[in-house]
């Protein structure tokens, strides 16, 4: 598929924000603890835990830190009253936005999320208002330089749904989220080292952002990611290379 890897661009932008790395680690640890508490400490039988482990490793978390978080979840933890909450809304330019949270206080969390939407010209929606536009999938991303045919053959044989190659040579492998770990293992075994790997919500449609709405969308994402309870922010905003250069 022709095009430029907007997915990769977003990931690179987030990865470059080193000042947020401590907060990112805190959120990943919270997800590891919760996933282990709810589904057990074996990633082979706990897809949510496997996804959290791959995300932790993609963000260069040490195995010691990762294993301690899993042990906390399996052994019972002070975060035992955490629950997953999904908020849906509309951002600048009519973008569809989903906000995944882990919280022990729904009132606090919804207040912070609503504030971010309101400050950037968006509004919080009701359950189901935008979720139908997204599909939960595994995404395994490769930097430019790999053999496209080798990645495609290994991925499809392992059960991937789709392989997308971009103009810059970057490759994204999309998988059913339930079998994400198995596909990742098969690609690793084939000697294909991923740049990042995680379970995400992939939009079925895109909303084009212009020079006016793109900065507002970026501000909304930043405000949401700054909330301690927010784990992930998904959206269908599409920012062209020309507009991105102006940000």
Swiss-Prot record:
Q: Which UniProt keywords apply?
A: Cytoplasm, DNA-binding, Transcription, Transcription regulation
One GO BP annotation is:
regulation of DNA-templated transcription
Can you say where in the cell this protein is located? Cytoplasm
Q: Does the keyword 4Fe-4S apply?
A: no
Q: Mainly localized where?
A: cytoplasm
Q: What do the Gene Ontology cellular component annotations say? A: cytosol
Q: Does the keyword Transmembrane apply?
A: no
Record's signal peptide: none
> A single Gene Ontology molecular function, please?
DNA binding
Could you say which protein family the record assigns here?
Answer: Belongs to the TACO1 family.
HAMAP family hit by this protein: Transcrip_reg_TACO1
What protein does this entry describe? Probable transcriptional regulatory protein PC1_1817
Q: What species does this protein belong to?
A: Pectobacterium carotovorum subsp. carotovorum (strain PC1)
From the broadest rank down, the organism's phylogenetic lineage runs:
Bacteria, Pseudomonadati, Pseudomonadota, Gammaproteobacteria, Enterobacterales
């Amino acid at each position: 598929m022709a095009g430029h890897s907007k997915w990769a661009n977003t990931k690179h932008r987030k990865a470059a924000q080193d000042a947020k790395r401590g907060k990112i680690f805190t959120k990943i640890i919270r997800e590891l603890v919760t996933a282990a508490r709810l589904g057990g400490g074996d990633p082979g039988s706990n897809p949510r835990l496997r996804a959290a482990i791959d995300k932790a490793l993609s963000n260069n978390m040490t195995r010691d830190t990762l294993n301690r978080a899993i042990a906390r979840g399996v052994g019972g933890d002070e975060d035992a009253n955490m629950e997953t909450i999904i908020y849906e809304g509309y951002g600048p330019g009519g973008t569809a936005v989903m906000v995944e949270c882990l919280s022990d206080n729904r009132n606090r969390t919804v207040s912070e999320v609503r504030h971010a939407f309101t400050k950037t010209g968006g509004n919080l929606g009701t359950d189901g208002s935008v979720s139908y536009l997204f599909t939960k999938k595994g995404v395994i991303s490769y930097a430019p330089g790999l053999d496209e045919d080798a990645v495609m053959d290994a991925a499809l044989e392992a059960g991937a749904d789709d392989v997308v190659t971009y103009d810059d040579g970057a490759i994204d492998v999309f998988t059913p989220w339930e079998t994400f770990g198995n596909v990742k293992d098969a690609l690793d075994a084939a000697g294909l080292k991923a740049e990042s790997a995680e379970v995400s919500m992939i939009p079925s449609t895109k909303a084009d952002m212009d020079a006016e709405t793109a900065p507002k969308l970026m501000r909304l994402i930043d405000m949401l990611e700054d909330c301690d309870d927010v784990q992930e922010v998904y959206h269908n905003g599409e920012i062209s290379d020309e507009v991105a250069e102006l940000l």
